[in-house]
From Swiss-Prot:
InterPro entries: creA/MIG_C2H2-ZnF (IPR051007), Znf_C2H2_sf (IPR036236), Znf_C2H2_type (IPR013087). It comes from Saccharomyces cerevisiae (strain ATCC 204508 / S288c). This is Regulatory protein MIG2. The lineage of its organism: Eukaryota, Fungi, Dikarya, Ascomycota, Saccharomycotina. GO terms for molecular function: DNA-binding transcription repressor activity, RNA polymerase II-specific; RNA polymerase II cis-regulatory region sequence-specific DNA binding; zinc ion binding. A zinc finger (C2H2-type) spans 17-39, 45-69. The keyword Magnesium does not apply. Its main location: nucleus. Residues 252-283, 316-364 are annotated as: Disordered. Belongs to the creA/MIG C2H2-type zinc-finger protein family.
């Protein structure tokens, strides 16, 4: 008893709920009831796992016990999955073989008269399924490296024979399989390049009994393909093409650009039109623009203008001023009739005094303008 009292907590005297047997105190009543089961031997929590009849007084003890069952079942599942994988590998459907080749089983439904007998890799025994559902093994290369001849071949049987009378003949079955593929490829119309590749693929090969069956010998194909592409005729054609291209470039560099006849469009002298634009052909912008002949052409085309009415942002804009010649003024005086025409004439005389005369600028007679104005302002004819 004194040994049990040493295990009591420090505030055991202050706890409201005490055990009548060992005088241990508890803060909550359910904790006291759970403690009483240790004295009475009551175990209300039973294990529900099949085949296990253990019982526990506390629920946490039952949970700890259930972990042993779940962990054991997980171990059993792992063991069963490993055994299943080993069975598939032994039965001729390996999932991953030595990290190089991958066999992907694809179930295929075939009629009863076309059922395929798959020979097991280890043991040499024949498996024949009566329900005509057989896995088709498709080889997939996991690495592009060439495979040695001792580890590459696949032999499916071609005729469903009974187990009692069937004897595995690997070389004959594989030869018939190759002959059927060759007949299918010979009937198809393909180009010469692919036909040559098919001929190389369909060459007869040995059929060793190795776990990595179902692969073609591809180690000599890249060398033969490179040998074909590097033929002397192709090399000769490339050489002649390079020679002709070099000669054409050399003649192009020696040529001098022909200076096209340039037309000069002069605009009125104005401080705003100080810049000019060259209207020469695009031949001057070739890489050999530093030639002296092209510099001369550029100097000749310096005075060519594309737009006579260009304005720049830095120049000062002024209103255009025109002056009517004296002959036109006399015509307007003779043709004016009425107060409106006299007013227009006086305005023209006043404005003409303040305008500057510009060379090469002529306006139509004022009488024509006035006639057009009268026609425009007059009654419209329907």
């Amino acid at each position: 008893m004194p040994k049990k009292q040493t295990n009591f907590p420090v505030d055991n005297e202050n706890r409201p709920f005490r055990c009548d047997t060992c005088h241990r105190g508890f803060h909550r009543l359910e904790h006291k009831k759970r403690h009483l089961r240790t004295h009475t031997g009551e175990k209300p929590h039973h294990c529900a796992f099949p085949g296990c009849g253990k019982s526990f007084s506390r629920s946490d003890e039952l949970k700890r016990h259930m972990r042993t069952h779940t962990g054991q079942s997980q171990r059993r599942l792992k063991k069963a999955s490993v055994q299943k994988q080993e069975f598939l590998t032994v039965s001729g459907i390996p999932t991953i073989a030595s990290g190089v080749m991958i066999h992907q089983p694809i179930p295929q439904v075939l009629p009863a008269n076309m059922a395929i007998n798959v020979q097991a890799v280890n043991g040499g025994n024949i498996i024949h399924a009566p329900n005509a559902v057989h896995p088709m093994v498709i080889p997939i290369m996991a690495q592009p490296a060439p495979i040695h001849a001792s580890a590459a071949s696949f032999q499916p049987a071609t005729s469903p024979m009974p187990i009692s009378t069937y004897t595995p003949v690997p070389s004959q079955s594989f030869t018939s399989f190759q002959s059927s593929i060759g007949s299918i490829q010979s009937n198809s119309d393909v180009s010469s390049i692919f036909s040559n590749m098919n001929v190389r693929v369909n060459t007869p090969r040995s059929v060793p009994n190795s776990p990595n069956d179902g692969y073609l010998h591809q180690q000599h194909i890249p060398q033969q393909y490179q040998h074909q592409t590097a033929s002397p005729s192709v090399a000769k054609q490339q050489k002649t093409f390079a020679h002709s291209l070099a000669s054409a470039l050399s003649t192009l560099q020696k040529r001098t650009p022909v200076s096209a006849p340039s037309t000069t469009i002069e605009s009125p002298s104005s401080p705003s039109d100080s810049s000019h634009t060259s209207a020469s052909s695009s031949a001057i912008s070739l890489p050999f623009s530093n030639a002296p002949s092209q510099l001369a052409v550029a100097k000749e085309l310096e005075s060519v203008y594309l737009d006579s009415n260009r304005y720049t942002t830095k120049t000062r804009r002024e209103r255009a001023k025109f002056e009517i010649p004296e002959e036109q003024e006399e015509d307007t005086n003779n043709s004016s009739s009425g107060s409106n025409e006299e007013e227009h004439e006086s305005l023209d005389h006043e404005s003409s005094k303040s305008r500057k005369k510009l060379s090469g600028v002529k306006l139509p007679p004022v009488r024509n303008l006035l006639k057009q104005i009268d026609v425009f302002n007059g009654p419209k004819r329907v």
